[in-house]
Each structure stands twice: as structure tokens, then as C-alpha cells.
């Protein structure tokens, strides 16, 4: 699913970097939250980024930067 990051909150747990994300799927208004380790998301995520969200059984397991749309 395609979405936009609304908030990105980095934190560390037992020495491992994680991110708490608030994202809004395209075409929806209700935000969703996800917590992912640094290896499940691209480097330096920022609010406003367009992303491609991958989930298994409704659980987000990977977030990639969405390719730029051509005009």
C-alpha cells in the first residue's frame, strides 16, 4: 500500500535503533502506527515522505521509499 509518513520518532532499545512511524495510507484519513527496527525501513525517513508499505496478515514488516511519480 502507498502512504505518506506523518511522523517519525527514532528510539533505541537495547542498543538497536528503531522507528515509531505514523503514516496515512493514500485515499484514507485515519493514520496508522508502526514500530520497526532500522533494518526494516530505508535510511533517514522523514515526515512527508511518500512510502510503499509492505504487510503480512495486516502487520507492517517493511517500509520503502516510494519511487518518484513521473509527470
Where do the protein language model's features map onto the residues?
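Short, flexible beta-strand-to-coil junctions
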Residues: 24-28, 56-58
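Loop/turn positions that initiate beta-strands
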Residues: 48-50
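Short aromatic-glycine-enriched beta-strand elements
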Residues: 12-23
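Residue-level recognition of beta-strand microenvironments
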Residues: 8-10
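OB-fold/S1-family single-stranded nucleic acid-binding modules
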Residues: 56-71
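Short coil-to-beta-strand transition motifs
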Residues: 1-4
